[in-house]
Amino acid sequence: MEVLKTGTTTVGITAGDYVIMGTDSRATMENFISNKNAQKLYQIDNYAAMTIAGLVGDAQVLVRYMKAEMELYRVQRKVSMPIDAAATLLSNMLNQTKFYPYMVQLLVGGYDTKPHIFSIDAAGGSVEDIYASTGSGSPFVYGVLEAEYQKNMSLDDGINLVIKAISAAKQRDSASGNMLQLGVVDPKKGFYYLSEDEILSRLKKLKLQL
């Protein structure tokens, strides 16, 4: 079984009306790097995304579940599911299986009438904040965020901050590494991924190594 455990770095922040989410791309099995291009950031609706840390199979099942539930909600009601409702749905599901838990740590982020970031644990505990991080690299991420985060920072500054935070974790956490994955929830355009070229360009401008 391929295991991410918490050996990863994920982060989500709000920046004005935007939500920015990012991860590293290293998957580990104990001390072995099993995959250098593991997807950990998923779009789950037009204006919502989710990051994963934990058992790959458990996390992927939950991603598929949330995609299906949010699409069904949108088809039936002609509107997108509110982000707090999505977080509640996911946390309730996890709580119902807490004695046989999904071994995951999740971030759910998105925009409805305002930006949201929720951190959700394996027992279904759900906490909303202006920024959040999961995985073994999270202590290093929080160090950067607490020093440099500003609530109404621009989208450009927010993207750069997420890159800096993940890069800091990669430098100190051996279970985090390789390429970064970043996405933005735009209140007008919806969710989109940043291209690898743009991420590399920003790393160069920030004088950070991949």
Swiss-Prot record:
Classify the main location: cytoplasm
Q: EC number(s) on record?
A: 3.4.25.1
Localization per Swiss-Prot or TrEMBL: Cytoplasm
Highest taxon of the lineage: Archaea
What is the activity regulation comment for this entry? The formation of the proteasomal ATPase PAN-20S proteasome complex, via the docking of the C-termini of PAN into the intersubunit pockets in the alpha-rings, triggers opening of the gate for substrate entry. Interconversion between the open-gate and close-gate conformations leads to a dynamic regulation of the 20S proteasome proteolysis activity.
User: What's an example GO cellular component term for this entry?
Assistant: cytoplasm
The Swiss-Prot or TrEMBL record annotates one GO molecular function as: threonine-type endopeptidase activity
GO BP terms: namely: proteasomal protein catabolic process
Q: Which reaction does it catalyse?
A: Cleavage of peptide bonds with very broad specificity
Location of the active site: T8
Give residue ranges for the propeptide: 1-7
Top enzyme class:
hydrolase
Q: Which family does it belong to?
A: Belongs to the peptidase T1B family.
- Oligomeric and partner information: The 20S proteasome core is composed of 14 alpha and 14 beta subunits that assemble into four stacked heptameric rings, resulting in a barrel-shaped structure. The two inner rings, each composed of seven catalytic beta subunits, are sandwiched by two outer rings, each composed of seven alpha subunits. The catalytic chamber with the active sites is on the inside of the barrel. Has a gated structure, the ends of the cylinder being occluded by the N-termini of the alpha-subunits. Is capped at one or both ends by the proteasome regulatory ATPase, PAN.
- Protein task: Component of the proteasome core, a large protease complex with broad specificity involved in protein degradation.
Q: Under which name does UniProt file this protein?
A: Proteasome subunit beta
